[in-house]
Amino acid sequence: YFFVWRRPPISPLFPYTTLFRSASTMDDFQRFDALIPAGFPVVLVDRIFETKKYSSVCVSNFQPIYRSVCRLAGKGDQRIGIIGGLPRLSSTQERISAYRQAVADCGLPEDEHLIQYGDSLENSACACLDQLLERKCDAIIVCQGLMASETIIYLHQKGIQLAQDIDLVSFVDYDSDVYALYANQMDSIIQPVEDLGQAAGEQILRRVEVPDAPIFENVLTSTYRPYNQPRAWSHSDR
């Protein structure tokens, strides 16, 4: 979907309709490109295309996911499953790539059935969880906040205890009472959502002011926090 910001031309900085593209499921660059008038100021938010025509602000989760898999393996977990978003999205592809690399480097069994895909919407994680639980996963990584909250609730309903019966790594990208309640029982990958929004806002204003500015790619990094570490401790690659 698109976030569109319209503002009347009250100053030279705002003569345009400016466009944010955030969390879109569009995978065809040509379709997207056809919608954009020439000279229109655009910043892609947490999405990239192979064709680098537009500036972008995104979050890299490669290292936090890689570290989380290695930590789980170090604890003795052997069957580590992962639930990603739509497979065609650039963010999903990076996260699954990090998982695959860590599984290989840690000498864990490479089982394609341990990789499941949701759609990052409500009620999309349960079917994935059923598949992973059927395959006796002893740890699960959930790559999106809403699906992670759904996972916590679903496991609780099944009587499966976090940090005892199964290890969980949760993405945190919005304020959630469910996450707050169980944060000390699972690893977390904290998304810099405020920094992402601020960076996107600053960059779109710059493009409005200087439409011919060079194309840029601003990459932020999420923060990995193991659950048995103090809340003040965290690791980020920023």
Where are these regions (language model features)?
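Alpha-helical recognition/docking segments in bacterial nutrient-uptake
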Residues: 7, 13-70, 74, 128-135, ...
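Short beta-strand elements in bilobed, periplasmic/extracellular small-molecule ligand-binding domains
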Residues: 7, 100-123
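Short beta-strand/turn micro-motifs composed of small residues
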Residues: 46, 58, 84, 117, ...
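Hydrophobic alpha-helical segments within soluble ligand-binding/sensing domains
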Residues: 55-82, 97, 122-130, 148, ...
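An alpha-beta-alpha
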Residues: 68-106, 212, 216-229
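Short acidic capping loops at alpha-helix termini that bridge into adjacent secondary structure
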Residues: 78-79, 110-114, 161-168
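Flexible loop/turn connectors
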Residues: 131-238
